[in-house]
Amino acid sequence: MAQFELSPRRLMQMEQGLAALETSPIGAHAFAFFSPDEVASLIKAAQKLPYRRAKSSAGNNVSQDFDICFPAPRERQFDACADLLERAFAHCLEQQPDLFDAAIELNDFAVQLYPKGSTGIGIHRDAKRYRNIVCVITLAGMSDFFISADRDGQGRVDIDDSPGNLLLLAAPGFRGLADPALRPLHGVDNIAAGRLSIGFRMG
């Protein structure tokens, strides 16, 4: 299969993934979606990007220990990846017109690079301005992405965002998120072997 091809199998994976997200009590769901060759091509593209150090604290005193490229250029492999996701979401929206409150346009793109031993990013919610769906794709490394019930980390649930998986988070406008205030609290820690991840959002 060509890289980032929208195959019938992928459409089924996305349909099932969004159905699982809609019924998830934690507002997050991850599932296998990308091939090793696709992940490798994204890693290669990410290695060419310019990074800057993220602020050590953001929002509600959320700790941050990583380098970031933002806004990252949606070009080449990144654009092919985003286009694949947009077309898959469009298919699902066509089947279920009330799934999202608008067609998905992934116009907010960031790449994050966590060094080995990083403290990660503290528990936080994505900003309200991000609509419908948040896509996180880990490309390399060993770390823990988790959802928690509160900012103290109670009720923690680790999510398998291994390279090749697509992690979806519910955002305002998604049918499965009844209350925008209940956007999932999440964070990243236990950066045992570094972490390289990309995030697509609809701003």
Spans of model-derived segments:
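Short, well-ordered beta-strand micro-motif
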Residues: 30-32, 138, 168, 199
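A general structural signal for short secondary-structure junctions and capping/turn motifs
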Residues: 20-22, 101, 127, 136, ...
